[in-house]
Amino acid sequence: MGRIIAVNSNCYHGYSIEQAIDGIAAAGFRYIELTATKGWTEHVFPDQSFERLWQVKERLAEKGLTPFSMSGHCNLMDPARIHDFISNIRLAAFFGCGYIVSSIGEAHLSDQAVASNEVVAEHIRALVPELEKYGLTLVLETHGDHGSGRILKEIVDRVGSPRVGINYDTANALFYGNVDLGADLDASMDAIRYMHLKDKGGERTVWDFPALGKGWLDFPLVFDKLAKAGNDCPFSIEIEFTQAGAKDLAEINQAVKDSAEYLTAHGFVL
């Protein structure tokens, strides 16, 4: 089996899951990362009715898209949010996903709790039986205060389970972590199980994440590092535009198509 290449439905923030499914399929992709991020993009969510969730499942099948992962960000430092994350695990299982993505802290809400890496590892370790029960792998995203692969690898190593790895978000590692990309990839490569391919435009600290190939992030370096390490982790494309967002649906659809063309030009098969 070749590398899975998907698109994160969060690219369609502010638009419906149906619009996301249609645009991603039209660009030639066969896989999707569903977004269930509280307070931000709730394309699917545990409190939606069974009928509504089934409609989404049928639309995916109709368009030939496999929901192989789900973005279910919760603050894993906060005991009060662990139950919410377990609900997200079960929702991911409902869609037949193999991966669930979360940052350590909240992705788009204020953190109500902070904790040491050891405490976070304990919280995650307690989730492993749920992950095993549903056949899921939890991938921790480079985000916020945990913006480097190096930091996340320390937590993953403390957890010590094959069910837990890193989701290396390429642009986040620069935007949040201010890393030397090559060195950080080297330091965390053996724990990277998943990758958000996200480009970076503008100044490093500016919210600017365009279509792949439209920014300045060194993707050939990333691809070379992965190839040399024999790491064929799934790719999930994420495009978040600028703080103002995409101007319309057509701009998102074009950015998704541009990203597909960028990857195929680099020898990848969608």
Please state what every model-predicted region is:
Residues E33, S69, V101, V139, ...:
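Conserved beta-strand positions in the central sheet of alpha/beta enzyme cores
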Residues V44-R52, A80-S87, D111-E122, G147, ...:
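Alpha-helix N-cap and loop-to-helix initiation/capping positions
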Residues S71-D78, G213:
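The substrate-binding groove and active-site-proximal loops of carbohydrate-active enzymes
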